[in-house]
């Protein structure tokens, strides 16, 4: 379904019918009813089951049609064999929303997928929206609507609200994450489990969360997506709305992707692909459930920006100081040495055995015997102009005695306080620090600094200009559909002849004899390159089908003859020998395009040449992509260091490279018959001298 609905009625239904409700203790349907009742749902609940007259003190109806009133939402908890018939009843009753927890549909194989599509056909014709199948429902914390099941709510006393909204394609993971966050004091606005996403999907709910005024941070567990370009649009919409999406992706490894396929029927893309798409969308990607909860906690509580994010550590242990320095480097945080002026002022307060540089090592003496000095030490560090974050690591027993004064000093200076002590602060102290909005509390030094890094990432995204840029710039040419050649892989000569009017490539012509080849070389000028051209001949270097550095007619004749001797072993139907002008040396990169059914068109960039598959230095984006998106790809790779000029080598023509990337992107989008398009290598010449695509593989 194309248009995302207003989900306000879904999250806050005036009436809910539970079809298939059971009186059996501990049943899934019974848990749905119990949680709705226990957490204070204010609307009408209609149990439906022909076997019962009454359920939990409520009248039970034999059929959905017997309910005398309108039903805003129907929860179907029947066996899967009865789900289709119940969906038909929902359509006849004009129920706008249906939730289907049952498994055994699209994730279970072709037969299940067929039934799932039948459910969707019914929903489409009746303008009904589905959540699931294979889901665990949802929770509206603001209105206390707990339409869910499972043990994750068993010991939750009340649905305390907050500013985090969560969506999970895995029901069990989502429930576990909600439970974990609630125990850590993180409050929610909404949580939904989307399951197979036959209709409404994670992006639909993210869009609703973005519009919700009470939601500041959106968390997501994603196994796979249907439309990468839409994910990018949703992520950017969130950033423009002042909100951030934190995402944990499951199914990154080959085995993980296989598990995703069996779990929900999705095809999971590689980690590299999703990493690039999340970056393009302005989402913060995390690597574990622990990181996810840490990011949600931090970003929901800290909502101000210090003057900078350079870290100064005040520690009572040399080991903690060493770790702080190491961790800052890993996390990309600046850890500057303090000025001589600050160090001189600190020397009268810091014990002789300590250190006044960064980290400031106050030793065990200050916490144990001179705790009254700590606020003054913190005050001096806060006055350091190039510092924005104060990382404090002392035993919690001592911090409990002075944290209010420390927080007041740090807050007054406009800095951010990060507490990274081993063990945990008392609950009240932790809550007070969190409530301030100017402090981060970590279980240890790493935890505290990683949380600082999350704030830095959010701030960096806030300053990105490409969020306001158009999604794609078509380049210098008005690209129209090119004539689609016959299916399969084009030869290099065919592909270059098709693309040469739009992209920078070496001049080249096809020769069938030594005489023709010499004539072409005389036209271009030496040196030249010779390549065998034949259908299916892709990796010419490995096949011995290319000759370089040919600088004379005699050398050309010899190389031509050697290639013709080689041809029967590597080329079936030989089209000839491609004679090209040889391009001077430069930085070699790869640029590729592909279409994935579950993601749409993608662009890939990285270090090129014959080692591309070995070093895997690549970055991805979804198409369409603007010039700034493409520039971000380039900056993410190791090749960018070479392009900027490495070890006295001249800087490469990055602007020329971006011109080619933009043109090629527009060409690929304008011609859906192109399944894959790869340029490897592209030689980036020194700044101002352009680029050349030396080899092309085009698959139709």
Enumerate the predicted regions with their spans.
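Catalytic-core regions of core metabolic enzymes
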Residues: 1-700
């Amino acid at each position: 379904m194309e248009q995302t609905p207003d989900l306000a009625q879904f999250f806050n239904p005036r009436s809910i019918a539970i079809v298939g409700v059971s009186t059996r203790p501990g049943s899934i349907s019974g848990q749905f009813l119990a949680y709705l009742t226990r957490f204070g749902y204010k609307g009408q609940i209609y149990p439906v089951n022909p076997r019962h007259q009454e359920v939990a003190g409520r009248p039970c109806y034999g059929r959905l049609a017997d309910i005398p009133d309108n039903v805003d939402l129907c929860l179907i908890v029947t066996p899967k064999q009865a789900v289709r018939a119940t969906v038909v009843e929902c359509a006849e009753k004009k129920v706008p929303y249906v939730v289907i927890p049952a498994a055994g549909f699209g994730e279970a194989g072709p037969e299940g997928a067929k039934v799932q599509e039948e459910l969707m056909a019914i929903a489409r014709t009746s303008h009904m929206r589905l959540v699931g199948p294979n889901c665990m429902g949802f929770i509206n914390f603001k209105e206390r609507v707990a339409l869910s099941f499972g043990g994750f709510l068993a010991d939750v006393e009340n649905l305390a609200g907050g500013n985090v909204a969560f969506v999970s394609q895995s029901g069990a993971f989502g429930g576990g994450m909600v439970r974990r966050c609630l125990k850590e004091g993180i409050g929610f606005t909404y949580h939904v489990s989307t399951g197979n996403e036959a209709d409404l999907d994670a992006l639909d709910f993210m869009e609703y969360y973005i519009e919700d005024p009470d939601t500041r941070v959106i968390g997501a567990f994603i196994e796979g997506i249907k439309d990468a370009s839409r994910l990018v649009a949703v992520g950017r919409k969130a950033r423009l709305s002042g909100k951030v999406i934190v995402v944990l992706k499951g199914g990154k490894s080959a085995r993980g992707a296989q598990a995703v396929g069996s779990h929900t029927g999705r095809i999971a893309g590689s980690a590299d692909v999703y990493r690039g798409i999340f970056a393009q969308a302005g989402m913060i990607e995390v690597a574990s459930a622990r990181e996810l909860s840490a990011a949600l906690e931090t970003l929901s509580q800290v909502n101000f920006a210090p003057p900078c994010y350079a870290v100064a550590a005040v520690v009572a242990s040399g080991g903690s100081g060493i770790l702080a320095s190491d961790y800052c480097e890993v996390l990309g945080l600046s850890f500057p040495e303090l000025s001589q002026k600050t160090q001189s002022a600190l020397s009268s307060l810091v014990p002789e055995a300590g250190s006044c540089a960064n980290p400031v090592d106050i030793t065990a003496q200050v916490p144990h015997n001179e705790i009254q000095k700590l606020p003054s030490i913190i005050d001096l560090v806060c006055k350091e102009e190039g510092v924005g974050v104060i990382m404090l690591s002392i035993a919690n027993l001592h911090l409990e005695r002075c944290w209010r004064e420390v927080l007041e000093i740090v807050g007054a200076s406009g800095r951010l306080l990060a507490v990274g002590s081993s063990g945990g602060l008392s609950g009240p102290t932790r809550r007070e620090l969190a409530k301030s909005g100017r402090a981060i509390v970590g279980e240890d030094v790493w935890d505290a600094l990683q949380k600082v890094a999350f704030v830095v990432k959010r701030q960096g995204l806030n300053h990105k200009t490409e969020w306001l840029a158009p999604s794609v710039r078509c380049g210098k040419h008005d690209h129209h559909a090119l004539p689609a050649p016959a299916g399969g892989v084009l030869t290099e000569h065919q592909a270059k002849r098709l693309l040469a009017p739009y992209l920078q490539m070496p001049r080249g012509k096809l020769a069938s004899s030594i005489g023709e080849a010499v004539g072409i070389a005389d036209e271009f000028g030496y040196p030249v390159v010779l390549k065998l051209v034949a259908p299916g001949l892709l990796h010419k270097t490995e096949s011995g089908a290319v000759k370089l550095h040919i600088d004379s007619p005699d050398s050309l004749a010899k190389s031509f003859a050697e290639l013709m001797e080689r041809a029967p072993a590597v080329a079936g139907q030989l089209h000839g020998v491609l004679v090209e002008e040889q391009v001077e040396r430069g930085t070699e990169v790869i640029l590729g395009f592909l279409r994935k059914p579950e993601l749409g068109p993608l662009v890939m960039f990285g270090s090129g040449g014959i080692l591309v598959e070995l070093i895997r230095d690549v970055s991805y984006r979804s198409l369409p992509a603007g010039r700034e998106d493409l520039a971000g790809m380039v900056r993410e790779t190791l090749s960018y260091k070479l392009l900027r000029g490495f070890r006295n080598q001249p800087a490469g023509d990055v602007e020329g490279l971006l011109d080619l990337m933009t043109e090629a992107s527009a060409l690929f989008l304008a011609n859906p018959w192109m399944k894959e398009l790869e340029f490897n290598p592209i030689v980036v010449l020194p700044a101002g001298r352009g680029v050349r695509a030396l080899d092309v593989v085009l698959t139709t």
